[in-house]
């Protein structure tokens, strides 16, 4: 046996030859020292023990060779001296004051003892040292041995803790790649919290989340971080200032006179201009506005409504209506995946084995909610192994998610989405953009809804039959909602399902407890002998928000999840609508005053409001003429049969041809120049008609019968060319239109040139079809 290597327990120590003289070579003789030197050295050791600092090499060598008897005598002498000083302080305090200083002093000493590293024994016989940041570079007495703590990442105790083995080495060995080692005692574990200490270095700080811009969704909703809302609002402010120069100048003068300082003046003017109320009644405050005009005898119109837009319906002998799609939402949609944006790591434990001792194991490896990693570390003589090589090491940490740091996905059900449509008649009352008209009615539709009839008071009834379409592919759409932590951030976004499912974040389904792919927010450090650090990647909210730039924004109001893009196609029945005030007498022309002078609405129309001091109710005489043709009324009234009622009225909206015009309301007159081009207006209305027909898609055609095909063709013609036809021949009567169509068809039949013949025939047919048609 003398020639063989001997391994010590639990991996063994360095191999050595059994020799009778070996103990004499390694053991140092404890010779007698001067008593004064021993006392001075013991005071130094005591000082370092009280302050928690590391001892110098001289004191370490002294502690190893000092005779036990001399050390005990020196400590007893120090104890007697401290006791004498304590008694003297107590006596002096009792003579001068009644305050007992002994009790606070003892409490302070005991508290200091409690705050130092504590040692406890587990049921399996192992010892556990619980240390804190102040215990770094200190020795701890454990039974008959001592343990040295060299860890630098210790903080105050909390859930973010770390536990690993304190290796046992011999007196002659030097520690290698360990933060804790013991001599004279085995099976010791070090545990400490890491709160309050500085974060360690990480190779990465975020996960990789691709931008969502490559997966565009259909629809024209507001997009986050695109700047469109700011641009749109600045455009509105600019338009209002340009149309209200006098009011703007007055506002600037008032601010300049009432406020001192250049910067406050500028701020007040800018804020006031951003909040100024513009002329607004029903659809006039919306930029996306469309006009649909029915010909004489029209009883049914097909409208295309989209979020953020409005359609004004006008027809001969019928009151004008504003119809718009107000909201698209679903109550409490189903929840799909839930992602964690900020991990909370607690209870880290490490187990390690020497080479050839098998794999390291931890019970936490088989528990849910933990993240583990296996690796190999360098082991050898300086860290309690008899062989040099790679040893197994495993680290596990408990994973949970921080509060208010989750991103949840919700999916829509097509059958449960509600579309809210609002209808409002033109009553001649001025209503500001932030006010609600008393005659406004609402109707809600789903996929299974039938026809709805709305009662508009004195204006009769209007029927709505709508086919809903979301404007986005709901099967591939997920509403990504964040916990609301910052008021300036949006609440939710409409994202593509594939992008949502591919997010590199921990996730779980609704109701589940364990997180899948929890290791995506955890990083493990380089393995040391018996320790492997664990790092938290931190909050990933900023990375997610960056990837959402350009994504359509959704909104959540209570349990209602709103879509920000979509459209519906509605058939509006006008047969039961009736005009109000047809039997009123005409108002006295001399008693009108301007309440709001004519101004451009931004939709190629003119809006105004007049006051009346005569007897009510009555009909307002209003017309407009072009320069040089005073006998022809060129005004197309959007507000039909404007009246002055007992409790309101006087708001008028009309459309004028481009050029110089004069507006007459009673004896009032106003010079007005209408910007634009007649040809451009025709082309624009034709373009809008084509857009409406495109949105209608397959719903615009009925191939079930010959009559259905002819009806579909007529409806398509009215949809595409109705606006242009009304612009060109809107002021021409019914009979002249019939005669014009017949004349053009007759000319086409008698033309010898085939091209001209076909042109006249098509033109005459269109005029007759648009005049005699009953739907648009």
From Swiss-Prot:
Annotated organism of origin: Langat virus (strain Yelantsev)
GO molecular function: protein dimerization activity; structural molecule activity
Coiled coil ranges: none
Cross-referenced InterPro entries: Env_glycoprot_M_flavivir, Env_glycoprot_M_sf_flavivir, Flav_gly_cen_dom_subdom1, Flavi_capsidC, Flavi_E_Ig-like, Flavi_E_Stem/Anchor_dom, Flavi_E_Stem/Anchor_dom_sf, Flavi_Glycoprot_E_cen/dimer
Disulfide bonds: 283-310, 340-396, 354-385, 372-401, 466-570, 587-618
Region of interest (Hydrophobic), residue spans: 33-68
Keyword S-adenosyl-L-methionine attributed: no
GO CC terms: extracellular region; host cell endoplasmic reticulum membrane; membrane; viral capsid; viral envelope; virion membrane
Intramembrane region positions: 728-748, 756-776
Biased composition (Basic residues): 17-27
Region feature Disordered, mapped onto this chain: 1-27
Keywords: Capsid protein, Clathrin-mediated endocytosis of virus by host, Cleavage on pair of basic residues, Disulfide bond, Fusion of virus membrane with host endosomal membrane, Fusion of virus membrane with host membrane, Glycoprotein, Host endoplasmic reticulum, Host membrane, Host-virus interaction, Membrane, Secreted, Transmembrane, Transmembrane helix, Viral attachment to host cell, Viral envelope protein, Viral penetration into host cytoplasm, Virion, Virus endocytosis by host, Virus entry into host cell
Cleaved propeptide residues: 97-117
Gene Ontology annotations of biological process type: clathrin-dependent endocytosis of virus by host cell; fusion of virus membrane with host endosome membrane; virion attachment to host cell
Carbohydrate-modified residues: 144, 434
Extracellular-side positions: 118-242, 281-727, 749-755
Job of this protein: Capsid protein C self-assembles to form an icosahedral capsid about 30 nm in diameter. The capsid encapsulates the genomic RNA. prM acts as a chaperone for envelope protein E during intracellular virion assembly by masking and inactivating envelope protein E fusion peptide. prM is matured in the last step of virion assembly, presumably to avoid catastrophic activation of the viral fusion peptide induced by the acidic pH of the trans-Golgi network. After cleavage by host furin, the pr peptide is released in the extracellular medium and small envelope protein M and envelope protein E homodimers are dissociated.
UniProt-listed Gene3D superfamilies: 1.20.1280.260, 2.60.40.350, Flavivirus envelope glycoprotein M-like, Flavivirus polyprotein propeptide domain, Tick-borne Encephalitis virus Glycoprotein, domain 1, Viral Envelope Glycoprotein, domain 2, Viral Envelope Glycoprotein, domain 3
Pfam families: Flavi_capsid, Flavi_E_stem, Flavi_glycop_C, Flavi_glycoprot, Flavi_M, Flavi_propep
Modification(s) after translation: Specific enzymatic cleavages in vivo yield mature proteins Peptide 2K acts as a signal sequence and is removed from the N-terminus of NS4B by the host signal peptidase in the ER lumen. Signal cleavage at the 2K-4B site requires a prior NS3 protease-mediated cleavage at the 4A-2K site.
Site (Cleavage): 96-97, 117-118, 205-206, 280-281
Transmembrane portions of the chain: 99-117, 243-260, 262-280
Residue numbers on the Cytoplasmic membrane side: 1-98, 261
Protein name stated in the entry: Genome polyprotein
